[in-house]
Regions:
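Structural/interface elements that position substrates and couple domains in central-metabolism enzymes
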Residues: 1-214
Length: 214
């Protein structure tokens, strides 16, 4: 059920981007401003549960079409995140190739964050990764940085993939001073209001965030 709900939220958020509307504003208007309705790239718990269900069904020679479709939609969101990142860099006049990107997410190569990092590396980007709750260091995974400032310094773009408390309270002014300009923020979990980010001089791009300007 959670995976299907998340798939619907993800599909609607992508639709809002296409139609140039703000998915999060719509949620507030409908009084549905609850995390269970938010789109996301990272949902490891749902993924594990879904594959357990699908594997069990397969062992019984049963086909579960809706759970399989929901899982496919959610898996494809990582590729959508890459496309959003590429588009936001392009709007700043920068190619994804050779761009330095600070990824704020989960320090686990097998996670959605890890898959995202792998894809942008294959496309020529130079990622750094910061996870405030992980004990993993660069000796285990070379892209990992031990501090937020180290991960962000000299980058073109910050991509926020997970909602750790530290990420919700970022000092945007200080971070921008560490970055190359024009600086880009790609918010994939909806923790920032676009005007707040843009007021600090960033180019903002977010999952489900059409500009809502016609």
């Amino acid at each position: 059920k959670q995976d299907a709900n998340r798939a619907l939220a993800n599909e609607l958020s992508v639709f809002c981007e296409i139609t140039n509307t703000d998915y999060f504003k719509i949620l507030k208007l409908l009084e549905l401003d609850d995390p269970s309705f938010w789109p996301t790239i990272v949902e490891e718990e749902n993924r594990n549960e879904s594959y357990l269900l699908l594997d069990s069904a397969e062992n019984l020679n049963a086909k579960l079409k809706l759970p399989a479709l929901a899982r496919q939609i959610n898996e494809n969101m990582v590729k959508h995140a890459v496309n959003l990142t590429q588009d936001s860099l392009r709007s700043a006049g920068k190619p994804l190739r050779r761009a330095k990107i600070a990824v704020l997410g989960t320090a686990n190569p097998a996670s959605a964050t890890g898959i995202f990092v792998k894809i942008i590396e294959q496309k020529g980007a130079k990622p750094s990764l910061y996870d405030p709750i992980s004990k993993m260091g660069p000796q285990e995974w070379r892209v990992v940085k031990t501090s937020l400032n180290e991960a962000v310094e000299g980058t073109d773009c910050i991509v926020i993939l997970t909602g750790q408390e530290q990420f919700k309270n970022l000092n945007l002014k200080k971070l921008k001073a560490l970055m190359k300009t024009p600086a880009v923020i790609v918010d994939l979990i909806g923790i920032f209001e676009p005007p707040k980010v843009e007021a600090e001089g960033f180019i903002y791009c977010g999952l489900g965030r059409g500009t809502d300007k016609n």
